[in-house]
């Protein structure tokens, strides 16, 4: 809902600098808000002084990220249009996050194991991760899976 509202405001050329208040949400949802055009993120539970800082920063032409969102810029670069996962890559990432092996994924999707391995390498490259553990951590941040 939040990202759609931000997009609506931007599509109607309303001159507004949008700060989003977020509760507990996966990083991918925060990133969707930012990609939609929000200028900052502040947690609902943050001290009111952080909102004042956000307003000051944004009114001076900067963006503002609550300290818990500091990874948003780093992570959002992983989801730029150049790095967007394909539907197949997203599907494979979900299966990896579910604990499936390359062989199990290949059987399930009726692909060769080599094709799955290639998709996995492409996913890791796009997400700028270098190990299976980093891949799972990123999947958690994206909201692909939960603990």
UniProtKB/Swiss-Prot annotation:
Response regulatory domain segment(s): 1-59
UniProt GO MF annotations: DNA binding
Keywords, sorted A to Z: DNA-binding, Phosphoprotein, Transcription, Transcription regulation
GO annotation terms (biological process): phosphorelay signal transduction system; regulation of DNA-templated transcription
Post-translational modification: Overexpressed protein is phosphorylated in vitro by non-cognate histidine kinases BarA and UhpB.
One Pfam family this sequence matches: GerE
Disulfide-linked positions: none
InterPro entries linked to this entry: CheY-like_superfamily (IPR011006), Sig_transdc_resp-reg_C-effctor (IPR016032), Sig_transdc_resp-reg_receiver (IPR001789), Tscrpt_reg_LuxR_C (IPR000792)
Extra remark: Lacks the N-terminal receiver domain usually found in response regulators, which is usally phosphorylated by the cognate histidine kinase.
Protein name in UniProt: Uncharacterized response regulatory protein YgeK
Organism expressing this protein natively: Escherichia coli (strain K12)
Taxonomic lineage of the native organism: Bacteria, Pseudomonadati, Pseudomonadota, Gammaproteobacteria, Enterobacterales
